[in-house]
């Protein structure tokens, strides 16, 4: 080899090599999947699905070329639990690839792969240590490897379709569609990684010595019914080389975590935790190092931590890292301090990490703080479970998994805490629960070849793209091209039936860009149907969900589509959304980025990146800016233009969105002065809008809330919806004013006065309760001290005392009595207080109260020094003291 190249140098060499072979170098696509069937980009070829399906190899802003090379960042989470536990599983990885869309084929792919791997100019690997696998019937590849490359035959293994075909076992099991053999390239790392041979590997397919570094896929067949493999009219090349894999070979390190990207992260984790990277604890070092890279890069790509979709997956990854940091003794937010190391390692190839570093850091820190509080809640939950169990008992595995799934407790932490109580965990039950959850996760993230190359759209095959005229027309005629129900073509649709209707021409806007799909009616001679929703396929086919009310609908009939009047309300809210976006950027700064939206007839919802709640002044500024636009009654125009021209003109694009060569730009023809600047609105958008800002009518912000770490959500109303909301608020003010015998003008003063009176009454009540407790305690605390289990326990029964007064009474009783523990029972409450000396001797208030509360018909828990519970029978709880020690 030429020497220990860095990961960045390997990446650059790969891309430069294929540029020298006439390939177009393209940047990595966002981790947000370009295909709606998956959450994340999971394969290097995924962004090129249209080209593999025959679309022109045109790439806006970069040119046209049927040869492409990329280093694509990818995320796969189906086996997330293995990350860190093994040294070769990653959730985020870089897949370098070269692709041919009907250009070169097998020979060039094999020869160029060999040249890049073995030439001293490139990676310079030892040819004698190279091995390959091929599909058992692929004599063409065998010939290229042996005759053109010169690889010895005993360095080649043939395998069946289950190993060397893509998709696996496609000839026998399908799916129908493009498929083909593949050839995998392996490198022999030497005897210090194992004493197995290449022949051994052929039998076991497991080896630390023989490492796969590249997979060359040759999609050359069209799999048809009966397992027939027909030749494709054009043949493609799809290769994938894992950058982390090849880096471990080139740098001659034992695993991914020892390469130049992960090593600094692992070392920093060891430094922060004070625990060296060795032994069993090293799993946690690896989890933290790997996951922080995944989370940082995904947030930089625009994914907001949330409770659904992509945001939920990334939040789970971050919380897994936080759990392992906790196991390392890092009980304060720490992961965010690793972000600069990720930026240093990856920012050169992915500049969005550099520009988004501050936002990424803030989002991770906020989520850490939130999760650590949740972790504390989990500790209380676990303590409550364990305190009600006898020593030697077994904690159900389902409970352990719920702690993991709800509070983020890893099994190791649950076992460690349970051992302190002399309790074990049913790990078999835990494993069963975990496997069920993992099966669900794998199903959600599965990305097979049938999805990459279609396969479930048979009912729509052969249909042309729908002509959409709804920007200018709310009524239009079109021919019924197809009726689809339950995935099949229908020959008619009777009254009372519902199905999907495909038209040649439509005025109905299809759901997209946050805007809901249009509703309305279809009318034809002798019939009528309700359009309940409108969607579209990636191929541009409009899908109308139609319920036939009258008559019969058949293919070939000409219908008149009439869009509902709700469209006008949708247009008001959509244009208002653009103005809101521009106003937020003006008031809060250019770092504001759209993170999601909903445009509906009754409201708009806008999610955006911002680290703090908006002040009343900021909300007021935003609302006034939008209202000034409305009052100005500027024209709203749109036109189509090349993507490069739109970007040069300053049009706002949705981060991570994939655009074509030509884009639609919606512009408000006028700006609003704000400070030293003039605020304008121009966005790439395919939605429906008003023709003038004055058509919005009115605008009001009704809420601002946090929805995820670093993401805010504003809900607002426009037009009649805004007017109705304002009227409802005024009615509420008048009604409440009447109830309080005041006028709207003096309502605030009246409420402030009532609050002051309430606080004074609450203080008087608290004082009375304290006095009642002191009166009941009297001076007889020494007579209430009992000797139990080697501890002096002061016991007291009170009446009418609860909450904070009960805890205060326990503090006082412990001080007055000089006892080790104080136990006080009231009508509905129980409290146990232990002195520091007693805790040091093994006393545990939380464990004791668990037993007493159970006897008193309640439950509770707490810390070793203080615990509280709700009970129904205080006498029974106190009676249980004799057996509780």
UniProtKB/Swiss-Prot annotation:
CDD domains this protein is in?
AlaRS_core (cd00673)
Q: What does this protein need as cofactor?
A: Zn(2+)
- Please name the GO terms of the biological process aspect recorded for this protein, alphabetically: alanyl-tRNA aminoacylation
According to the record, cofactor stoichiometry and binding are noted as: Binds 1 zinc ion per subunit.
Q: Which SMART domains match?
A: tRNA_SAD
Tell me where it mainly resides.
cytoplasm
One Gene Ontology term, aspect cellular component: cytosol
Q: Domain notes, please?
A: Consists of three domains; the N-terminal catalytic domain, the editing domain and the C-terminal C-Ala domain. The editing domain removes incorrectly charged amino acids, while the C-Ala domain, along with tRNA(Ala), serves as a bridge to cooperatively bring together the editing and aminoacylation centers thus stimulating deacylation of misacylated tRNAs.
- Name the chain's protein: Alanine--tRNA ligase
Give the top-level enzyme category. Answer: ligase
UniProt EC number: 6.1.1.7
Q: Which reaction does it catalyse?
A: tRNA(Ala) + L-alanine + ATP = L-alanyl-tRNA(Ala) + AMP + diphosphate
Q: Which HAMAP family would you find in this protein's record?
A: Ala_tRNA_synth_B
Per the record's keyword annotation, is Ligase included, yes or no?
yes
From which source organism is this entry? Deinococcus geothermalis (strain DSM 11300 / CIP 105573 / AG-3a)
Keyword Zinc attached: yes
**Under the GO molecular function aspect, what terms does this record hold?**
alanine-tRNA ligase activity; aminoacyl-tRNA deacylase activity; ATP binding; tRNA binding; zinc ion binding
Q: Which residues bind Zn(2+)?
A: 574, 578, 685, 689
Q: Where in the cell is it found?
A: Cytoplasm
